[in-house]
Amino acid sequence: MPNSLAAVPSMRFPFLSLSLAVSIALAGCSNESTPPAASTAAPATTAKAPVKADARNHDESSYAQPQLVVIKDLALDLKLDFDAKQIGGTATYTLEWKDKAAKQLVLDTRELSIAQVQADDGKGTLAPLQFALAPADKTFGSKLTIEAPNQPAKVVITYHTAPTASGLQWLEPSMTEGKQLPFMFSQSQAIHARSWVPLQDTPSVRFTYSAHVTSRPDVMVLMSADNDPKAARDGDYSFKMPEPIPSYLLAIAAGDVVFKPISARSGVWAEPAMADKAAKEFEDTEKMIGAAEKLYGPYRWGRYDMLVLPPSFPFGGMENPRLTFATPTVIVGDKSLVSLVAHELAHSWSGNLVTNASWKDIWLNEGFTTYVQARITEALYGVEMAEMEREIDQGDLLAEVKDMAPADQALALPPLAERDPDEALSQVAYVKGAWFLQFLEQRFGREVFDPFLRGWFDDHAFQSATTDQFVDYLNKNLLDKHPNTVSAAEVDAWLKQPGIPAFAAKARSRSFSIVDTARIAWSGSGTLPSKQVTGEWGTQEWVHFLSGMGATLKPEQLKQLDETYHFTGTPNGEIAMRWYPLAIRSGYTDARPAAGEFIERVGRRKLVLPIYAELLKTPDGIAFAEQAFEKAKPSYHPITTASVAEMIAKAKAAPPAQPQPQPQP
């Protein structure tokens, strides 16, 4: 929802914590433009203003009305047009009408051009239906209202996307690893699926789907479905997803990719130059699947494959079922960042199998997944490894909540009325959610808690759930059966109160005490820890070493670190995102050119936004950031582009910041 230390000694552990390797925190992205009114085969009225959130009573982020009618199956027949940067074709919906009085089908769209809407009687006869496409809301897109007085069992929509669709990125060959063929991919979470398919774009609705996709014959097309590793690259592809999924898990990609098997049910797709390296990096995937199955039951999605995308992918990973999307920034040669796989794999139970019913309950996806990820880590790599990850995560969370509104610090968020769900997501959902489950585990013991959690997954498989439903399940299946172990007030403190409860046990890593001692010794004497000490450090220890530095250091101190560990120019994004901001704040100018090259080359939001944020605090930094952004923009994903553009605009509009105090020699 997605980097080792290139110049630092080899890693002792191949996992990295969520806050380091699996930041799939969603980017706030909305398209300001309003698409032209679509032509109508059967004219209908057009709304005169965007429909506001108070008209959406089930999910504040969707116009859909699933209490009246739901999509049960989606059949796509699409053509990919790389020249026009568009997807076009038809979407056929099999519907279940829940209300006999319902006369309309309402769908979510964003920047879609709707050519026609038809009712399908199932016998080959299509009849036009009236529809109205409302003007666009900048966050939620356009409400598509289809008049369906006879409640047809199937509806067919002919449409095409805009080149600026927020959920799609089209890359020129020069932006790929191979430099020969174009590449495209989707990112549907949280509410971007509506930019490439008209849908009930809410996680409360699940549907099966099939797809027929045509493209130029020299690219391979893949979807979050049953991709055939032996499929011919011929420009004509068919897919089927037999398990019901929510709209945000609908995914497509096309490019010059080849397949490398890892196990009988798992493998990796990547550009040819990256394929062998990716397969080697992810070779422990089958062990991870086995560890998760032992804890939480069988993997229910058939295959678990991964697709390594170009560097412009804005996240670390995306848990698209049967085809996890992954950033290439985790392919570093030492397996130090493959916790991304553990996190996205964990979503196969928490998120994909049991899904938050709306984005205000996203902790049910991300908190559970972070907890499951930690259990996989512990099963494969030991208790101390998991404890280090928890301590890093918890420290990052405690720092983040200091600047958050109290309501945003609760796990059960208030309704997201008129609020982009991307912007509402924070480490609270991930880390506080996992911390709550760890608290329950500690109180009840694993012999009780593990069967409870597996029961939650089994009893709600292929369903969406709310926080209230989880609390009911918790009461009936855990608290009531084991009275006087956890109180309702304690549960309330986790779910509805800001901050972390005072009774929460914090993670404590023994390994980090050695790192702290080494850092303190260097700060006092100027003597860096010996290779005998650092040779035993893994990625977590190095990140902890850098994260514990003060806000600024003397330039000569940074130079000493740089000459010893070669942080400047590292391809390790996790180090880069910590090193470059520290260098910029401290006036260590030797690092600035490499910082610029890094943000021009990498489009992953987690890695580049902290560097932009630090640059934008000074006038010369703003100028430098603008120059780098102009070079990077052609290869950035629309989500990253929107985030950086907003940051720059705010920085230029703000009064000049006071200069950072520099350490005195």
Show which residues each predicted segment covers.
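Acidic/His-enriched low-complexity segments
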Residues: C29-G302, F444
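Hydrophobic pocket-lining residues within nucleotide cofactor-binding pockets
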Residues: L112, P244, V330-I331, I584
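Mature, folded catalytic cores of secreted/periplasmic enzymes
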Residues: S62-V70, A75-K79, D83-Q86, T92-T94, ...
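Intrinsically disordered, low-complexity segments enriched in small/polar and acidic residues
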Residues: A6, A38-A41, T46-A47, P182, ...
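Gram-negative bacterial Sec-dependent N-terminal signal peptides
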Residues: L5, P9-S30
